[in-house]
C-alpha cells in the first residue's frame, strides 16, 4: 500500500499494520479466540484446511516453513479495506520447494469483528507456480 493512500486511516488497516507474522505470540492480542485461517491450494493438498486460533496459525506457518526449508517470505503489495469487516491484501510470496524457486501472487482476505481479527482466507495463485 502506498503511503499516500486515502484508506490509510481505516481502523482495520491500522490493526493489520500491528500484525507481525514473525512474532505471532506478540501479535496474539490482535486475534479473536476463535480465529480461523482458511487455506486452499491444490498444489499443496496436505497443507489445505482450516487452522483454528493463534496456535493453529503458528502450526500453518510451521508447516509452510518446513516444506520450504525456511525460504518462505511474504512481501505485502497492497491492502484495501472493503466495508467495515474486510481488508483485501495482495502479497507476493517467494519460496523454494524441491529446489524450485517460486514467486507467486497471493490474496489474503482478512475479516475483523469487534476490533479483532476473526478470520482470514489465504488464496494463492496456485496455477501460476511455475515461473
Predicted regions and their residues:
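A general structural-boundary detector
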Residues: 2, 14, 44-47, 97
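Short charge-dense sequence patches
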Residues: 6-18, 38-41, 57-61, 116
Amino acid at each position: 500500500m502506498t503511503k499516500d493512500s486515502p484508506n490509510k486511516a481505516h481502523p482495520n488497516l491500522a490493526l493489520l499494520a500491528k500484525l507481525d507474522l514473525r512474532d505471532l505470540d506478540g501479535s496474539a492480542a490482535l486475534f479473536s479466540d476463535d480465529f480461523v485461517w482458511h487455506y486452499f491450494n491444490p498444489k499443496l493438498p496436505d497443507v489445505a484446511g482450516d487452522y483454528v486460533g493463534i496456535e493453529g496459525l503458528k502450526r500453518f506457518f510451521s508447516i509452510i516453513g518446513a516444506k520450504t526449508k525456511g525460504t518462505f517470505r511474504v512481501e505485502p503489495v497492497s491492502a484495501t479495506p472493503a466495508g467495515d469487516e474486510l481488508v483485501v491484501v495482495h502479497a507476493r510470496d517467494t519460496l523454494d520447494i524441491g529446489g524450485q524457486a517460486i514467486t507467486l501472487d497471493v490474496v489474503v482476505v482478512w475479516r475483523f469483528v469487534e476490533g479483532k481479527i476473526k478470520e482470514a482466507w489465504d488464496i494463492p495463485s496456485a496455477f501460476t507456480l511455475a515461473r
